[in-house]
Each structure stands twice: as structure tokens, then as C-alpha cells.
């Protein structure tokens, strides 16, 4: 949605609501709206929209993955687990489901479970940048700094090979946040802000930004984006 890319949160919500009014049975409209209000920390509303999307399209990996995110932060932990497991049973290589699973684990400080989930995802695609960045983050959280830095090196290699089509800055943000290098994390986060990367919309809810949560630089980014803050951030 254009309004979300422009960080016009009210306008984006109006667009999503209008899309649902035009076609109430369109699962993608409902899960997209769920993702939007999840980013705004309206977790129970997001879970309700995600549940309706699942009813409309029960086998969609995209729908089930983001339902898993919405359910988790609405306190429906078992529903979240079931949704994500459903995705990975049908499509084990669907890395977004592994990422959401891992982020949910990080929220609960279940770091070993997160590591297993991400390592499994890498068996299907060993160069998936977001999985590498998330795993580097978790390695940092458990003191495996050298292992995390090796993954940062791999990310740099992948980025360099892309030439004029650089990858998203977010894998670096996650990695450096977990490894305790806040200055580098904010260098890449600022780059993501300047590029208006889609993952910026989750600034208030991303557990992999947990180590940055109290930093004034994160608060400044939230302010510049005009992101509403409706509840305490999730742990991370």
C-alpha cells in the first residue's frame, strides 16, 4: 500500500479498510491490514483480522506466517505455534515462517530454540540474508560473538556480490544489535530509514531490536516516522 510506504499510518489504515469493504472475502487484504495494525501495537485487533484471513485462505504460507506473529503478541502463543508449524510442515523452506518463529522465541529469551529454528532454515538456503542476520543476532545474545561476526562477514560478501542491487540493511541491523555494536546497528538502521525499507514499519514491535529499545536514537527514528506508540514494546 502506497500510504504505508509513505508512513502515512492513518491513510494506510483507510486504504486497508476500503479494500476489505470492497472484498470482505479477500484474505490478502485482511492479513495485510493485520500486519499494519500489528506494527501499530494493536495486537488483539491484528489477531482478529489474521484469524479471519486464515479462515478465508487456510493453506497460504504468507497468511499463516503473519497470523503466527499477530497471535503471539496478542498472547495466543499456542495459536501462533500451530500457525507457524502448519507453514513449515507444508513448505519447510519458507524462511519467513522460520524468522517469525525465531523472533517469537527471542521474545521469550528462548535463544537455543531460536538458533535451532534458524539453523534449520539455512539448510534450505545457506545464503538467505535475513536468516543469517537473525542468527548472528542470537549468537551474540548467547555470547557466541565470534560465530556471529563470521555471519556478518558472510553478509558483507553477499551484499558485495549484488553490486548495484544492494540487499536490505536489516540483516546488518539485527546482527549488530545482537552482537552489542549499537553504533553499527544504527548506521544500518539509518540507512534503512533513508531507503524507506518496509521492515521499518515494525520498529516498535521487532524483538530483534530489543537491545536498542532504550536508546534515544531509536526513539528519534520512531518520532521521525510518526509511528504511534500505543503500548509497551515487546521484550527482546
Regions found by a protein language model. Give the residues of each.
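Membrane-interface transmembrane helices that cradle and orient dolichyl/undecaprenyl
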Residues: 3
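Alpha-helical protein-protein interaction modules
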Residues: 8-236
Amino acid at each position: 500500500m502506497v500510504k504505508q510506504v509513505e508512513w502515512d499510518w492513518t491513510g494506510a489504515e483507510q486504504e486497508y479498510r476500503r479494500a476489505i469493504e470492497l472484498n470482505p472475502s479477500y484474505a490478502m487484504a485482511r492479513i495485510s491490514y493485520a500486519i499494519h495494525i500489528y506494527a501499530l501495537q494493536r495486537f488483539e485487533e491484528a489477531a482478529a483480522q489474521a484469524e479471519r484471513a486464515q479462515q478465508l485462505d487456510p493453506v497460504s504460507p504468507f497468511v499463516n506466517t503473519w497470523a503466527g506473529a499477530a497471535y503471539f503478541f496478542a498472547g495466543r502463543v499456542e495459536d501462533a505455534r500451530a500457525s507457524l508449524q502448519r507453514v513449515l510442515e507444508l513448505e519447510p523452506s519458507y524462511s519467513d515462517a522460520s524468522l517469525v518463529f525465531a523472533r517469537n522465541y527471542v521474545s521469550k529469551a528462548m535463544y537455543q530454540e531460536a538458533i535451532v529454528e534458524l539453523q534449520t532454515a539455512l539448510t534450505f538456503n545457506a545464503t538467505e540474508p535475513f536468516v543469517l542476520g537473525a542468527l548472528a543476532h542470537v549468537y551474540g545474545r548467547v555470547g557466541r560473538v565470534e560465530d556471529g561476526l563470521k555471519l556478518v562477514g558472510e553478509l558483507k560478501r553477499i551484499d558485495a556480490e549484488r553490486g548495484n542491487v544492494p540487499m536490505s540493511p536489516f540483516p546488518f541491523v539485527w546482527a549488530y544489535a545482537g552482537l552489542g555494536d549499537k553504533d553499527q546497528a544504527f548506521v544500518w538502521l539509518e540507512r534503512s530509514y533513508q531507503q524507506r525499507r518496509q521492515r521499518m514499519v515494525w520498529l516498535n514491535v521487532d524483538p530483534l531490536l530489543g537491545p536498542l529499545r532504550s536508546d534515544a536514537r531509536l526513539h528519534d527514528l520512531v518520532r521521525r516516522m510518526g509511528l504511534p506508540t500505543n503500548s509497551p514494546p515487546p521484550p527482546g
